[in-house]
Amino acid sequence: MAQLQGWANHISFCADHTYVACPDAGDEFFDCWGEPSRTGPDRVLICSAEGSYPVANCYRCSLDFEGKIYPDTACIGIYALNGVCHQSANCFLITAGVTLTFEVRGYWFTLLAYGTYGNFYTFWAKFLQCSLAAGAEVPASGEIAVAINPSLPNQIRSLYEASATEVPAPSRNEMLIREAALVTRFYAPDIDPARFRDLHAGLLAAKDAAIASGLTRAELAARLNAVAAEYQGILAERLGAAVYERLMGVPAGERVDIIEPGLQAAAGVERPGSAPEGNA
């Protein structure tokens, strides 16, 4: 086992960039699509726990976009369609039983848009494959169910496994709504997710429409950031300034883009190794 640390770098007018460090493995890093600054006052340690470096190292999935390397995507798929750096960071942290928290500016919003791990089903299959290759044990569903204080990653896993028996099967967006409600209750138990469920559904519909437009790169980034700005305003009005700031990590009225300026060229662009958009 080795210590896995989730870090956040502040970016002006944008959600924090997140990455994962493993000091016990010779100061190895999972950069999560970008090139984070690892020094200076603008980085914050968000979480830290013991996990498996070999398992995380198995699914780095760096991608080559026309000669530019986007490192350590965690196989989440297509940037801005399946997730952003926050989802990749959570994938690298999963064996440590922790996730990013709402201390990360803008993380709550990317959770609403993409979930904790991007496409849970796609990531879980890759995670099991890498766990098997590394000889790591994955707890059975029954072991999770009887745990007194199951970790948030295990609660998310249980949520998705329980949905497998539903008829008709819930849509991907419905699962994102349920997952975000679970995570919100975990980190802010006094905030009722029912207060924003309808707005969450509207956000997902607007995000899907932007993706279905066929735009890519800077144009898609601009469209998604505009959707984010619109719904940030609506959510702040519904929840109130104090609650909104607790969840978003920024004051109401402060715009937080979800697509990083330095990663716009990857937005919506499929490359070998990218996963499809996700389950319906």
Where in the sequence are the language-model features?
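Non-catalytic ligand/cofactor/substrate-binding and regulatory segments of enzyme domains
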Residues: 1-162
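Charge-rich (acidic/polar
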Residues: 149-280
